[in-house]
Amino acid sequence: MLNPALEHIETYKVEGGQEAEVKLNQNENPFDLPSWLKDKILDQFRHEPWNRYPDILPYRGMAAYASFLGVKPELVIMSNGSNEMLYTIFMACLGAGRKVLIPEPSFSLYDKLARLQQAGVVEVPMHDDLSFDVDAIIEAARREKVDFIVLSTPNNPTSKSLSHDEIERIVEAADAIVLVDEAYVEFSREQSALDLIDRYPNLIVLRTMSKALALAGMRIGFAIANPELLAEISKPKIPFASSRLAEITLMAVLENYSLVTDAVQYILAERGRIEAELTEIPGIHTFESDTNFLIIRVANASEVFRKLKNAGVLVRNVSGYPLMENCLRFNVGLREENDRLLELLKKL
């Protein structure tokens, strides 16, 4: 009676839970919004009618984000988190008999959504250093005649990025819709693919406000694409999905973007410091990061995960991903949280 694809899909779980003295397992921004800004947001929200539906789409929030990006409003659509936008795009691009190419490892939701749509999944392994194999992606897309390509860059869980030129090579070569998921772009050394949208009608760029903008609890995401493509991929989208509170919050944060800039600078400085200290710890291999999180390889990831959790520090065991045996992932936290983690790792 149910979708047969459910037999091959597991319920999403966060190993170790979501509570800890030092929580570094979900790639979150360690800085919450300041109280004065929350008060401003709530004061505005109090004057909104709570008994009325919000707009079908949050047009004011979309216009504000388009202005922030420097693009036309008709290129932008807002969603209830980037995950909701992923559901929408996958529904629009895939179905039985169609194929999607996913570099592996990548964000686990991609594979889940593809299988729910009963689409074929073409996996292209990363290099051993977890970097993208661009030539293999292009070759597989042609050979398999895929309809859709999903590129998480910077990538979760590997923390590696495609260069701007590499993205353009793939988009230009592909006879397919290409989704570039830029959830972590604010932390990257590489240039965004946004400027390619005017030249490539098959390109979609995905953004989230959950990471750099510290709005994970508000659920705000965006897709940016040419108007014709955006109109088509928006057809399956759930109406009224974005709350007025989320829209007001987004606009307030964009008006005070120096808070984001300061947080990103802090995180990048801490990332560099953590990487430098990790390289001095015997038995730990550190992969260079282009995100707000780091990947390390240890002798026994399950044992290290357990010891850290017992000491009050929650990280993510990503050993189940291809090429990531005995790897752990943790986001950059506050300096004192990072020091706690480093101290424990040095004692292992």
Swiss-Prot record:
Cofactor needs: pyridoxal 5'-phosphate
Entry's Gene Ontology BP terms: L-histidine biosynthetic process
CDD domains found in the cross-reference section: AAT_like (cd00609)
Species lineage: Bacteria, Pseudomonadati, Chlorobiota, Chlorobiia, Chlorobiales
Quaternary structure and interacting proteins, as annotated: Homodimer.
Pathway connected to this protein: Amino-acid biosynthesis; L-histidine biosynthesis; L-histidine from 5-phospho-alpha-D-ribose 1-diphosphate: step 7/9
EC number(s) given by UniProt: 2.6.1.9
Listed name of the protein: Histidinol-phosphate aminotransferase
N6-(pyridoxal phosphate)lysine, modified sites: K211
Superkingdom, taxonomy of origin: Bacteria
